[in-house]
């Protein structure tokens, strides 16, 4: 009976454990047209190296727009036509980090940028 209670208690503890996914973006700022910025996203709470990752953005007063995607191993990379040739997505699985290098910035690139799993 005592052993059974221990197992019930252990299961109850494990069921209460939750893994919180966190994605924290940094690197934004003000730049003139034609300038560059590099965004970073620090990931935690999940096995980063197992997931494709994305950058999306939301311009003032508009909906979300997909910007770019990268596969878990960086083998497959995709860009929206609006940023192709100007933006470069990359990742460092050892650092659980996602990046977006943005060059030749335009006024229409003004937005809040989010990384997404």
Curated annotation (Swiss-Prot):
Record flagged with keyword Protein biosynthesis: no
Disulfide bonds: 41-115
GO cellular component: extracellular region; immunoglobulin complex; plasma membrane
Region (Complementarity-determining-2): 70-77
Ranges for domain Ig-like: 20-117
Compartment annotation: Secreted; Cell membrane
Annotated segments matching region Complementarity-determining-1: 45-52
Superkingdom to which the source organism belongs: Eukaryota
Record region (Framework-2): 53-69
Location of the region described as Framework-3 in the Swiss-Prot/TrEMBL record: 78-115
Keyword entries, A-Z: Adaptive immunity, Cell membrane, Disulfide bond, Immunity, Immunoglobulin, Immunoglobulin domain, Membrane, Secreted, Signal
Main location: secreted
Signal sequence extent: 1-19
Segments of this protein annotated with the region Complementarity-determining-3: 116-117
Region Framework-1, residue ranges: 20-44
PROSITE patterns, per the entry: IG_LIKE
Entries under CDD domains matching the protein: IgV_H
SMART domains: IGv
GO BP, sorted A to Z: immunoglobulin mediated immune response
Function of the molecule: V region of the variable domain of immunoglobulin heavy chains that participates in the antigen recognition. Immunoglobulins, also known as antibodies, are membrane-bound or secreted glycoproteins produced by B lymphocytes. In the recognition phase of humoral immunity, the membrane-bound immunoglobulins serve as receptors which, upon binding of a specific antigen, trigger the clonal expansion and differentiation of B lymphocytes into immunoglobulins-secreting plasma cells.
Subunit text: Immunoglobulins are composed of two identical heavy chains and two identical light chains; disulfide-linked.
Listed name of the protein: Immunoglobulin heavy variable 3-21
Taxon lineage: Eukaryota, Metazoa, Chordata, Craniata, Vertebrata
